[in-house]
Design a protein with these regions (language model features):
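Glycan-recognition and catalytic cores of secretory/periplasmic carbohydrate-active enzymes
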Residues: 1-275
Length: 275
């Protein structure tokens, strides 16, 4: 919706925004009686192809773009849908373990726990919670991931909060924790979020640096950590941008009125160079 809505604004053609908005509403209207949505839906029939409700991959951008459509276009319906989904997530998926906040994958119709595994992609969610007004939970969830980072140096792709062990030992040079730290810092300017961002950046330099750039890791539990041989495209679009904006205080960016897409594209808040 943010990208398609922006395209409609730039071209003057409302079809792009209407199509994206229609798809978001279609998913929301098929939510369960618990107000949860699942990870997979048949786009032709509208039937669910999964029973799993998660804040991680397959659902993460849906929640993010509901809020973003409110932030970017003042779409009150998207704000309402975001609020309904978030209340349901906090009611049915929120889990506290050893004073750390996590979010279980649950059956979207019964609320029964399906998995206690978290994928690294979900670590963005603390920032989104903060944006939506649940700053206490957003801060707590980000701190939970920061503790995992402290344990392994860099985040594993999968982590089971029930066993406190990685379920996937790779690291894909992902930016989500830095994203959350930057988003939370924009909200309250706490130095803690800069500290988490700094540790994320320094760990990347230490472990992911290769002779000609940066690469993902094959095993974050190995000593020393074992590198793979791949640099994903989102690293260029997101990662370095979050680090830079978190510390640069650049006059080129409006730190109070801005919007970055899920791929880190600045759709609002970029200022011209002053002559």
């Amino acid at each position: 919706m943010p990208e398609w809505g922006t395209l409609s604004q730039l071209t003057g053609d409302p079809r792009y925004a209407k199509a994206a908005r229609k798809a978001m509403i279609a998913v929301f209207e098929r939510r369960s009686p618990l107000d949860l949505v699942a990870t997979k839906i048949d786009v032709l029939s509208g039937a669910w192809r999964s029973r799993t409700a998660t804040i991680g991959s397959y659902c993460d951008s849906f929640f993010e773009y509901l809020w973003d459509s409110w932030q970017l276009f003042s779409d009150a319906d998207c704000k309402r849908m975001y609020d309904v989904c978030t209340v349901a997530i906090l009611k049915h998926q929120q889990v506290w373990k050893d004073h750390q906040l996590w979010f279980a994958d649950v059956d979207f119709e019964t609320g029964a726990v399906i998995s206690t595994e978290q994928d690294e992609l979900a670590s963005f969610y603390g920032g989104l919670l903060g944006q939506g007004g649940a700053l206490k939970q957003g801060a707590a969830y980000t701190e939970s991931w920061a503790k995992v980072q402290a344990s392994y140096g860099v985040l594993p792709e999968g982590y089971d909060y029930a066993t406190s062990r990685p379920t996937q030992v790779t690291n894909a040079l992902r930016p989500e924790l830095a994203d959350a730290a930057f988003t939370l810092w924009l909200i309250d300017r706490s130095p803690r979020w800069r500290e988490i961002g700094r540790l994320h950046f320094e760990a990347m330099k230490r472990w992911n640096k290769a002779p000609f750039g940066y690469t993902d890791l094959a095993d974050v539990t190995a000593t020393p950590k074992r590198q793979a041989d791949h640099c994903p495209g989102y690293w260029w679009s997101e990662q370095m941008k979050y680090y830079y904006l978190l510390f640069a205080n650049t006059p080129r960016f409006d730190y109070f009125d801005n919007y970055l897409s899920t791929e880190g594209n600045i759709l609002k808040g970029l200022r011209p160079i002053q002559a």
